[in-house]
Structures are given as structure tokens and as C-alpha cells.
Amino acid sequence: MRVRIIKARSGDCFVIDFENGHCILIDGGYSNTYKAELKPYLEYLNSKGKVLDYVILTHYDEDHIAGMIKFFEDNGEKQRVIPVKEVIVNGFSSVACDDNDVKPVSAHKRGIDIQKASSKQEYSFENWCMDNGYPINRFKSGKSIIAGDIIDCEDYSIKFA
């Protein structure tokens, strides 16, 4: 197993690459992270016949989701960059939210492409994924993940703590 830390400035983006062809993407950094660092690496993995078993979005701050949005826009329904089996989000999908309660979150870093992230964006991201054939939290029947949840895979398991 190899953990690749993708250059994301103050953001987060990691790819776990197993020798047996399995891969996991954790967070997407900023949109510039995707364009400059993540996309070329995902295309490389795809050229080697690898797939993303899981794309995990830990939370909806700008420095985690902006690159993820760009990735899914590029990948599209036909999964042109790399095949994705399942998306795991830690989000609002199972929580009722009034539009008046939505508070935008943004990062203000010099030289970084800034987009705002909010619960509205989260809801839109999740809906877009589902509408384009990317299952969300399938291992939990679409419900939010909680500490203690475990995904058992062929050769490994993931425990959320």
C-alpha cells in the first residue's frame, strides 16, 4: 500500500494505492489542486487499470471539496478520468436543514481559486453524484456515517473513528 499526499497548499488530498488495483481518494483539496496535481495522478492510475473503490469527502470546507467538485465535473457520468465505485460523504444528507440556516463557509488564501462551500452546496454535490451514477454511502444505505462504522472490502477494511 502506498499513500500519496497530493500537494494541496493548506488543503487536504490523499490517494491510497494498493498493489492489487484498489485505490481510495480522500478529499480533493482546492480546485487548483485537482487541475495541477490530482487529475494527472488519477489519469496515471487509470492507465494502469486501477479504479477508485471509494472517494471519501471528510467534510465540506473549501480546501476539501473544491477539487472534488472539479474532479466529478471532469469525470462525468461516463467516468472519463477514472472509474469510481462509491462516494462516501460525512454530511447533511440525513439531517433536515432549513434554507435560512445555511451559513456559507469559505477560505481566503492568496493565490488560490476560491469557491464557497455550504450545506446547500453539499446537498447539490450529493444530488449531482447520485443523478450521475455515483452511489453515496451505499454501505450505509445512503445514511450518514458515524464513528465505529466499518466497511469490509476484499483485502482491507476501513473503520471510521
Language model features: what each stretch is:
Residues 1, 69-161:
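Flexible, acidic/histidine-containing loops and adjacent segments that form or flank the divalent-metal
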Residues 13, 50-55, 146-149:
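Generic detector of contiguous secondary-structure segments
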